[in-house]
Amino acid sequence: MEYVIRECRLEDAAAIHKLNSEEMGYDYSLNETVGILNRLLFDAQHKIYVAEFSGRVVGYVHIAVYELLYAPKLINIMGIAVSSSFQRMGIGKALLEQAELWAKEIGASGVRVCSGSNRSQAHALYRSMGYGDGRTQLNFKKMFEL
């Protein structure tokens, strides 16, 4: 199977929106996805790569610089998804390798990824690529009415 990993373009928004909805269960409008993608593509602190197969985007990884006052600079994987029809073909691994490449290019000390506790297939991939288990945390969120 031939696929290519390339930098994301604005015209990839619909495919990313579909992956977010179908593979990760996020209900976020296409218009909002286009708006945020348009901003992130020009933000040097963020990078988005897509996996393309026969002209169709079948996966993506969104990474961002992660800097703290108490640890060295890392790259944080903000989102990674591969179409269920294309999973277990090496695409997720290739996307992670691309993220690691960018991390090294910008002088980051490593890559950080948080993953839902039910995503055992993803956990197996991360472990197979040398990612160690971090500490268990709870994720709190407070949304504001706009």
Task: Locate the predicted segments by residue.
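Acetyl-CoA-dependent GNAT
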Residues: 3, 7-11, 17-73, 78, ...
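Short hydrophobic/aromatic beta-strand or adjacent loop that forms the aromatic wall/cage
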Residues: 46, 135-139
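Short coil/turn segments at alpha/beta junctions that flank glycine-rich nucleotide-binding fingerprints
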Residues: 73, 89, 105-109
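A short, internal acetyl-CoA/4′-phosphopantetheine-binding micro-motif in the GNAT/acyltransferase core
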Residues: 80-87
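Conserved acetyl-CoA-binding loop-helix of GNAT-fold acetyltransferases
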Residues: 88-101, 128
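Conserved GNAT acetyl-CoA-binding A-motif
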Residues: 96, 103-115
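Terminal substrate-recognition subdomain of acyl/acetyltransferases
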Residues: 138-146
